Every structure is written in structure tokens, then in C-alpha cells.
Design a protein with these regions (language model features):
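Acyltransferase
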Residues: 43, 79-85, 398
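N-terminal glycine-rich phosphate-binding loop for ADP-containing cofactors
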Residues: 3, 22, 74-79, 90, ...
Length: 689
């Protein structure tokens, strides 16, 4: 064995040279790895005794991608494009031996080899689009040559990995080998190539799968228009694959290179890379280190089988944790379980679950009408109506029933966890776990730390979030926590704007164009205008109250802020317009022209300001945690990085200037937070905190 450098070595097995990369944890393509591979290939290529080469990685995976710590820094070592050219032009057959994940630059390197073999569990993909860029070392040019244009479009523009078996079907992998015998099988595969004098299959020279039909690209764009809305990178990926079809290989490579260089310096890629790291940061809690012991959660109890309770329960059942679900009435229990079953059956219809899986999952539920059934649960989550008195009563009863050491969690979206915890003799075991609706789909989990919540309870809740595929963000106790507290700012301004001169569809249009999935009024119509409304307490003082009194309660009644046709397609409503105009006149408001810019600033800047207050009060650990809440819980566009990142992008001095201008015009709702003032005075942004 010859060590090329500290992370790459070269060994001979008969006439086959084996290059091994050993750079834990994931063999990322650092400068050392790239340079080592280039030197090893050149050395083996020049050795007359060597007839074929295998590239293989030690540890748990093949090269898992670029080394993102090198992003944005001056380049060192041999560039990946050059390493790939050395591999492809090697006069001896080069075989990539793949296990674990061959992603991004790792797959691009494998595409530059003449042959690829993989173990059955391997995954291969080009996820660069998720970081707001395109593959930059030949991925967009070589992949369509191997798998065809249609499959390449999906793999590259969606950024989703494919399994080894699928990769073999599509021609990306030449052989699927033994799970436990990769190295030996790859060497045997290479030796067989030598024995048969097999040709050097250079991917760059293959054109048999490059169909140039423009209709394929047009159809792909049309089908995915909604999915790609607002994002720059997917369109850039499509254009690079078009280049693979219309340009000679080297020109296509140059086009790809120019594209990645352009995207790398754009705000979208900056935002998407920021989110990638921010999500990992969110799991780190300064006073709850990774070494904090966690409690074993073998069984979960859920109180409430409604929309929230059922959705929450599915998360645990999906990962094999049995759930006892409790309701007060049998019909509520039956209804809840039948909704869950229907959800699973729909997933099965789409081919993502077998009917046997559906039965296995349903078999993990134990329904009950008695809270005492929760006595053996390790975690109990209360998902009852959002009312403090009801929640206090439930926790008082739980205190007497739950076993010692059980975690007692509330799924409240606004209420004070400390007051709820005070109903028990064990406030250290109480925590907030605020799921977002639909709870089996939305990725966010706000974990609410009470004044007395124990550290191992926090560590357990954050770990569980990961287990059930959620992004856990730790927040402090305050009305609405992080997400809903900031949302209230936007909602207040949206409501004021429609009386001052805008219409609901103006506000919705501006926020939709900004990149949000829907505006506040379309959202209210979808959720139901009568949530939290009652005829007894209605004063008829807001458009929403008047709409509810008229039984215009949103999509479910065919009309709310908007009118809906039989397909639930919304259109501007003259009824709503008249309600707003009459109410404004009654309140003595002189309506005026409101610009799109004002709508955006008044809806977004107060949220940024509220985020600053949340940081000031220590209710969130870092600005990026607030951004992760908004991206995963409220559909904030990833390519804008979150409200706090957006504030930094606009420039906090500009945000402050506009807030002060609005404060002069509209009063205290726009008073800037002390933190915002301080950061501007120091010439800093939230990123510097």
C-alpha cells in the first residue's frame, strides 16, 4: 500500500490498482481528497503492471459530495472538473465502487469513471439544486448521456437521490454487487474488463440517449411550474441539460461552469446555503449539550383524536412507536381513527405504502375513553381545544395518572406552559411540543421550554423531533411563541391595510409574489373565518366578523373574503368590497391608494422587528432559529432565507428607516426594538449576533 497523502492511498490487487479514500466522516471532496485522487490515478495510469483501476472509499460511504466548508473560500488543490478529466482520459478502465451515498461532486466523480458498481443500499444523486446552485463538475452534461434527458431532468432539478436498483435500470450503474463484498466484487469486475479487453466507456462520448426534442423540456417546465415558482436554480438546471443536448461536450461543460459561478454569488444560493446550515444549528442548545442523557420513549399517549391529535399520533406510529389515543366520546375516537386510516390508505393508493403496512400502522394504536390508559406511557401529548382552563384540568388529572419520569407535553400554540406546568407536582417534566397543521406533513416542531423544564426533557423532545422527521426549534414561553407571535404582526397590518385602501386580493397578490404559498386572506378562507369566532361575542367591527355573521365563513361555505366556484377557485368578491368600503366610511377612514411596496413593507418589517424583540427577550436562541421556524412552519420561501435573513439582505438600516417613517404615520405598532436600533448603530446585522 502506497500512501498518496493522509487521506488517499493506492494498493495493488493483481493487475488492478485500488485507490482508497479515507477522510471521515463522509469522505467529502476536500482539496486533499481531490489532489490525492488525481495523483493516484496518474500514478496507476503510468504503471505498466496496472491494467485497471478501482476507486473505493473507507468508512460508511462513497464520496458524499463537495466539502461545503470550502464554499466561498479561495480554491485550493486540483479542481474537481480537472480530477474528472484525468479520470475520464485515463487509458485504463476506471471503476467507481459505490456504497452509502454518492451525492453531488461524489456522483460527478463516479460519472467520470468508465464504469460504476454499487451495493444494493447505495443512493446516488445530485442535490445541488437544494443549495440554490447546479452541479458544477459535469453532472448536468454526463448524467443525461447515461440515463436520458427525462430522468436526468428529474434527478437534477428535484435534487432527489435514486436507489442503486433504479440507477442500474437506467444505466447509471453497470452492476449491483454484494452488500458486504464491495471491494472484492469491484476488483473482480475490473479484472473481468481486462480479461475481456472491454472498451473504455467514456461518458462524454455517449450520445445515444441524448434526444433533442424541445417538447420534453417544455412539458417538464409546465408540469413543475408551481413547484419551481420563484426559484432560480431549477430553471438553471434545465438550461444546463438543454446545453448537454445542443452543444458539444466541452462547450456544455463551460456553460455549466458559467451557470454555477453566476448562481454561487446570487442571493438565492446564499439564502439556501444559510438555511442548510441554520437547520443543523437549530439542534444545538448552549446549556443542553449533546452529552445530556435522554429518556427512553417506548410508548406515547395522545389526548385528543381530532385533526391535530390524529396527525401528531401518525408521526410516532410511522416510526414504529405505539400510541395510546384518548378521547372523551366513542364517536370522536372512531372518527379520529377512521381519518387516520383514510390518510394511510390514500398513501397506499399512491404506491408509497403497502396495504399490509397500513394494517401494521393501524395495529400500533390503542384507542381508549379513559385517561388512566396513559399510565404506562413515556410521553403524553395533550392536543385538546386551545383553552387554558381545559388544559389546566387535563394536566391536573395527568399528574395523578402518569408514571414517574413520564414527559407531559402540551401542543398549545399560544398559551403559557408555566401556568399549565403549575397544575402538576412535576413542572420539570412539562414541556410544550407545538406541532403545525397538518401535523403528519408539516416539518416544524416548536419545542417550548418552561421555566422549570428539565434539561433531559428538552434533550429528549429535540431528539424525538429528529426521530419523527421534524425540525425541532427550541423556543421560550411567550404569547404565540416565535411563529404565531410574529404572524400576529403581519395579520394586524394586513387587516389595517384593507381598511386604509388596499383590498384583500391586493395584499394576497403581493405576498404571493414575494414567494409565500398564499396570502393572509386566502389563508383565512382556507382555514375557516369562524375559527375563534362566535355569534354571541361578535361586535361586527371587522370585515371578518361581518363576513361570519353573513355565514360567509371561507371555502367550506363557498364564500369568505373571496367568492368560490364549484372547483373552489377564488375570485374577488364585490360583497367583501362593499363590506370593507362601508366599514371604512363608518370608522371615518379616508381610503387612499396603497402601493405594493407599502403592502410588503408593512406586512414584513414589523415581523422582523418582532423577531428582534424575541431575540432581545431570549425567547429564541439565535436569529437563524426564527428563520427555520418560518421556513418549516409557515411556508416562507427558502430562497429568501427567512424573515431575519431577509432583514439582513434588505439592510437593517433600511428596515429601521422605514419602521420609523411608519411609526410617525401609524403610531406605536411600528416602534423599533432596542436590538434593531443597536445593530444599526453598530453597523451590524442579525448574522453578527
Amino acid at each position: 500500500v502506497t500512501a498518496i497523502n493522509e487521506v488517499v492511498d493506492l494498493a495493488a490487487e493483481g493487475t488492478v490498482a485500488v485507490i482508497t479514500v479515507n477522510s471521515p466522516p463522509v469522505n467529502a471532496l476536500s482539496a486533499n481528497v481531490r489532489t490525492g485522487i488525481a495523483e493516484a490515478v496518474q500514478k496507476a495510469g503510468a504503471d505498466a503492471a496496472v491494467k485497471a483501476i478501482v476507486i473505493h472509499c473507507a468508512g460508511r460511504t462513497f464520496i458524499a459530495g463537495a466539502d461545503i466548508t470550502e464554499f466561498g473560500k479561495p480554491p485550493k488543490g486540483v479542481p474537481l472538473g480537472e480530477v474528472n478529466a484525468i479520470l475520464e482520459s485515463c487509458p485504463k478502465p476506471v471503476v467507481a465502487a459505490i456504497h452509502g451515498t454518492a451525492l453531488g461532486g461524489g456522483l460527478e466523480l463516479a460519472l467520470s469513471c468508465h464504469y460504476r458498481v454499487a451495493v444494493p443500499s447505495a443512493k446516488l444523486g445530485l442535490p445541488e439544486v437544494k443549495l440554490g446552485i447546479v452541479p458544477g463538475a459535469g453532472g448536468t452534461q454526463r448524467l443525461p448521456r447515461l440515463v436520458g434527458v427525462e430522468r436526468a431532468l428529474e434527478v437534477i432539478a428535484f435534487g432527489e437521490p435514486m436507489k442503486a436498483s433504479e440507477a442500474a435500470t437506467h444505466g447509471l450503474v453497470d452492476a449491483v454487487v454484494g452488500e458486504a463484498s464491495l471491494r472484492a466484487d469491484a476488483v473482480a469486475f475490473a479484472a473481468k474488463l481486462v480479461a475481456e479487453a472491454a472498451p473504455l466507456k467514456k461518458v462524454r462520448d455517449r450520445t445515444d440517449k441524448l434526444s433533442a426534442d424541445p417538447a420534453v423540456f417544455a412539458a417538464f417546465r409546465k408540469t413543475n411550474a408551481r413547484r419551481f415558482r420563484g426559484f432560480e436554480a431549477p430553471e438553471a438546471c434545465i438550461q444546463c441539460i438543454e446545453a448537454a443536448v445542443t452543444m458539444p461536450f466541452d462547450e456544455g461543460l463551460k456553460y455549466e461552469r458559467d451557470t454555477i459561478m453566476r448562481l454561487m454569488v446570487g442571493t438565492q444560493s446564499l439564502a439556501q446555503r444559510y438555511v442548510f446550515f441554520a437547520e443543523r444549528q437549530a439542534a444545538k442548545i448552549p446549556d443542553v449539550p449533546d452529552t445530556t442523557p435522554t429518556r427512553k420513549i417506548g410508548k406515547v399517549g395522545i389526548i385528543g383524536a381530532g385533526t391535530m391529535g390524529g396527525g401528531i399520533a401518525m408521526n410516532f406510529v410511522n416510526v414504529g412507536i405505539p400510541v395510546t389515543i384518548v378521547e372523551t366520546k366513542q364517536e370522536a375516537l372512531d372518527r379520529g381513527l377512521s381519518v387516520i386510516r383514510k390518510n394511510y390508505e390514500n398513501t397506499a393508493k399512491r404506491g408509497r405504502l403497502s396495504m399490509a403496512d397500513v394494517e401494521t400502522r393501524m395495529g400500533r394504536f390503542t384507542p381508549s375513553l379513559d385517561l388512566a390508559a396513559l399510565a404506562d406511557c413515556d410521553l403524553i401529548i395533550e392536543a385538546v381545544f386551545e383553552n387554558m382552563e381545559i388544559k389546566k384540568e387535563v394536566f391536573g388529572k395527568l399528574d395523578a395518572i402518569a408514571k414517574k419520569g413520564a414527559i407531559l407535553a402540551s401542543n398549545t400554540s399560544y398559551l403559557d406552559i408555566d401556568k399549565i406546568a403549575a397544575m402538576t407536582t412535576r413542572p420539570e417534566d412539562v414541556i410544550g411540543m407545538h406541532f403545525f397543521s397538518p401535523a403528519n406533513v408539516m416539518r416544524l416542531l416548536e419545542v417550548v421550554r418552561g421555566e422549570k423544564t428539565a434539561k433531559d426533557v428538552i434533550a429528549t423532545a429535540m431528539g424525538l423531533a429528529k426521530t419523527i422527521g421534524k425540525v425541532g426549534v427550541l423556543v421560550g414561553v411567550c404569547h404565540g411563541f416565535v411563529g404565531n407571535r410574529m404572524l400576529a404582526q403581519r395579520q394586524r397590518e394586513a387587516n389595517k391595510l384593507i381598511l386604509e385602501g388596499a383590498m384583500p386580493w391586493d395584499v394576497d397578490r403581493v405576498l404571493y409574489a414575494f414567494g409565500l404559498p398564499m396570502g393572509p386572506f386566502a389563508m383565512s378562507d382556507l382555514a375557516g373565518l369562524d375559527i375563534g369566532w362566535s355569534r354571541e361575542t361578535s361586535k361586527g367591527e371587522t370585515p371578518r366578523e361581518i363576513l361570519c355573521e353573513m355565514d360567509r365563513r371561507g371555502q367550506k361555505t363557498g364564500a369568505g373574503f373571496y367568492d368560490y366556484d364549484e372547483n373552489r377557485v377564488a375570485k374577488a368578491s364585490p360583497v367583501t368590497e362593499k363590506i370593507i368600503l362601508d366599514l371604512a366610511a363608518k370608522k371615518g377612514i379616508n381610503r387612499r391608494e396603497v402601493s405594493d411596496e407599502e403592502i410588503l413593507q408593512r406586512c414584513i418589517y414589523p415581523m422582523i422587528n418582532e423577531g428582534a424583540k424575541i431575540l432581545e427577550e431570549g425567547k429564541a436562541i439565535r436569529a437563524s432559529d426564527i428563520d427555520i421556524v418560518w421556513i418549516n412552519g409557515y411556508g416562507w420561501p427558502v430562497y429568501r432565507g427567512g424573515p431575519m435573513f431577509y432583514g439582513d439582505t434588505v439592510g437593517l438600516a433600511e428596515v429601521l428607516r422605514v419602521m420609523k417613517e411608519f411609526e410617525g404615520r401609524h403610531g406605536a405598532d411600528f416602534t423599533p426594538s432596542a436590538l434593531l436600533e443597536r445593530l444599526v448603530a453598530e453597523g451590524k446585522g442579525f448574522k453578527d449576533l
